[in-house]
Amino acid sequence: MSRRGTAEEKTAKSDPIYRNRLVNMLVNRILKHGKKSLAYQIIYRAVKKIQQKTETNPLSVLRQAIHGVTPGIAVKARRVGGSTQQVPIEIGSTQGKALAIRWLLAASRKRPGRNMAFKLSSELVDAAKGSGDAIRKREETHKMAESNRAFAHFR
């Protein structure tokens, strides 16, 4: 039995302009090589583009996109009797949001386009509407979990 204490769960801080935790989580995931100011620039440009495209509150579009992409269940590889099974597990809200942000950024990086702000804004608008690569990834994950429901007792 471990004598080590459990780590305290860190809460994400909110960003300076929008005072929103989701924006800050997005900034921290898009960050490369410690260039946080560039990450903030990309996010804020993307938010402005969302404002221009949809003519609604861009933060509500962001919230809607992340909520739409957040998975409720995923599969985890588990070794049982010499073979590896894909065991479906439930995902908490924090982990689900983190996965959703990761999928949104991966999908926007794959997109063809001028720059990252343009690609990210397009992906977020698509995800808010219920289409796009990130939504497809969520559906794929849910389908995998559903097809491996027989192994749910291996948890």
From Swiss-Prot:
Compartments, record wording: Plastid, Chloroplast
GO BP terms: translation
Q: Which GO terms describe its cellular component?
A: chloroplast; small ribosomal subunit
Q: Record's PROSITE patterns? A: RIBOSOMAL_S7
Keywords, in A-Z order? Chloroplast, Plastid, Ribonucleoprotein, Ribosomal protein, RNA-binding, rRNA-binding
- Determine the domain of life of the protein's source: Eukaryota
Similarity annotation: Belongs to the universal ribosomal protein uS7 family.
This protein is called Small ribosomal subunit protein uS7cz/uS7cy
Q: Which organism is it from?
A: Lactuca sativa
